[in-house]
């Protein structure tokens, strides 16, 4: 005889849905900022993938788009200068890397200010508040704050993940400092990596691939 179905007890003090979204958004911002700490000018800027992904560029990109989605979409205004978005002939990917004339401090301050401005705009809105994303297709432009917070959280987590990998490629630093990685010595990590590599080679061999 199967046990009767039970309903889990309700959380005595559930978090407001908007507060939950904002808390996770703040956590991803902090994770992204943390990946740029303690690096040289070269390391914080240099591209580590074929498509040029770099840490300072990720911060510049997120700073640029979050103020668009979380401020401008809902009628907010700001005085942030983002010349890489100006004009019809703007350079592709200009928001994804920092020029030699753009200081690290300028990009970090842009990130902090865009976060503050975005949060100030969102603070006065309900999740069902409506806005318009002018750069989206006409049939999708009208949105709610709920939609955009989820979209921006997805965007932020996506790029925080990029930053995690790029930082590990730069100097081996990994994780978020909140116990998300097991405590292992360099030798243990080397042995673990070799096990993964050996398994990949064996799987390829069984599939008839040459490695």
How should these model regions be labeled?
Residues 1-19, 65-117, 128-132, 169-211:
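Short, helix-capping/interhelical loops that line the mouth of catalytic, cofactor-
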Residues 158, 163-166:
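C-terminal or internal capping secondary-structure element at the end of a domain, subdomain, or sheet
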Residues 40-49, 116-150, 170-183:
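Acidic interhelical loop/turn segments
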Residues 9-27, 42-65, 93-110, 133-158:
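Alpha-helical scaffold segments that form or flank carboxylate-/histidine-based iron centers
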Residues 35, 69, 121, 166:
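Short alpha-helical functional segments enriched in proximate histidine and acidic residues
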